[in-house]
A protein has these predicted regions:
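Short, flexible helix-loop junctions that flank or precede catalytic/ligand sites
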Residues: 1-393
């Protein structure tokens, strides 16, 4: 097995999220949000380039050499898929690889709000999944889609760049198109998506006005449309969407969003008491009041509306983190460090019955001890690069 494939296997064995290949540094691997070197071998440009070239073809090599950028994916049979981003830095090659496991986790196994099951079974509307890079957006969306796949007949259609999780046909037929492999570009794929009779559409990441407009149009035409967006929370997501459009188009945009948006799900991963990571989730359901705020452009009022919402399933990050603290999943310090408003979280801890019990040291569940051999401190068997392997690539 080549050196790069052995690295991929190591990522799977250690449940790592990323590896980093950079000149002048050893290979670094990230586990549970903590990056560490796997050995003390400093890499040079030939080594980094050789590792990359082991897993890309001649066409991809030419693209990288011509454009100095490459985004692609590699599947290792029985192990999983790996999202590869190659670039140049300080005149030298560099690579970041994200691990996408073979198995889509069951929705119930992720500790997510139960309302997500109801949301993914909706007939129409726009669902936005937002969060920072590495926050688990893709995993949560894949688990939600696979739950629909198990529960509903129909056609699930994805347009991704690249395809990440691989779905099996269950009750639904699932067709997955990859930009660059199955369609020439995102624009062409988006234009033709409605002609392929989908019931549920995943269009990957929204990066610009064109993608956003397509997502809204799909929802308006009676489809359930899912997409991801880089934003910290619902408020930032709405502001980012608005920023895609010129001032003269925003009134129409806000009217369309207020009518089509089903919910915004925001996620961030926080360190739990076992040394692993758990998802804190904000859910903004588009209630009648939220829809009115969106239509009026009063985005700054949404946070308070969510805090006071009587809509079952809606919750802010502070409410999600409070539940995790109360249930002994995370420490109070970890919760405060990840809250949008530490003051609001402290208020919940000190001014609710469950919070008062926690503050008095009466946690519902005692903190679990870290699992032995699990997490970022798990030992590595020594990984050495044979220079002859990379030189042959």
């Amino acid at each position: 097995m080549s050196a790069m494939k052995r690295l991929f296997q190591l990522m799977a064995d250690k449940k790592a999220s990323d590896i980093f290949l950079s000149v002048g540094a050893p290979i670094n691997i990230k586990i549970n949000g903590v990056a560490m070197p796997i050995n003390q071998q400093m890499m040079d440009g030939n080594t980094v380039r050789g590792l990359l070239y082991e897993v890309i073809d001649q066409k991809q090599r030419k693209e990288y050499e011509d454009t100095l950028e490459l985004n692609t994916a590699f599947t290792l049979q029985g192990v999983g898929s790996f999202r590869i981003s190659a670039f140049r830095q300080k005149g030298s090659p560099a690579v970041v690889v994200r691990y996408i496991p073979n198995i889509i986790p069951p929705l119930d196994s992720l500790g997510l709000p139960p309302v997500l099951k109801d949301i993914i079974l909706e007939k129409r509307g726009l669902i936005l999944m937002v969060g920072a890079t590495g926050s688990g957006k893709s995993t949560t969306l894949a688990a939600m889609l696979d739950y629909r796949n198990e529960q509903r007949t129909g056609h699930i259609f994805t347009l991704e760049e690249p395809v990440e999780f691989i779905f099996q046909n269950k009750k639904s037929i699932v067709n997955q198109r990859e930009v660059g492999t199955d369609t020439l570009d995102m624009r062409v794929g988006l234009k033709n998506a409605l002609r392929q009779a989908p019931d549920c559409i995943l269009i990957g990441e929204i990066r610009d006005k064109e993608n956003m407009t397509s997502a809204i149009q799909y929802a308006q035409s009676g489809h359930l449309c899912l997409a991801t967006l880089h934003a910290n929370n619902s408020y930032h997501a709405m502001n980012r969407i608005i920023s895609f459009y010129p001032l003269e188009s925003r009134t129409a945009l806000l009217q369309d969003l207020s009518a089509t948006l089903k919910c915004v799900i925001s996620q961030r991963l926080v360190k739990n008491v076992r040394g692993l990571r758990s998802a804190a989730v904000e859910v903004m359901l588009n209630s009648r009041y939220i829809a009115e705020l969106i239509e009026k452009g009063e985005i700054g009022e949404m946070k308070e509306a969510m805090e006071k919402a009587l809509t079952p399933g809606s919750q802010t990050f502070e409410q999600s983190l409070f539940k995790m603290i109360r249930d002994g999943i995370i420490t109070q310090d970890e919760g405060l460090a990840n809250a949008d408003s530490a003051n609001n979280l402290l208020w919940l801890i000190n001014n609710t019955a469950a919070g008062a019990d926690f503050a008095a040291g009466k946690e519902r569940n005692p903190q679990a001890k870290p699992a032995a051999g699990v997490g970022s401190s798990a030992p590595f068997s020594e990984f050495k690069l044979d220079s002859s392997e990379t030189e042959r690539a």
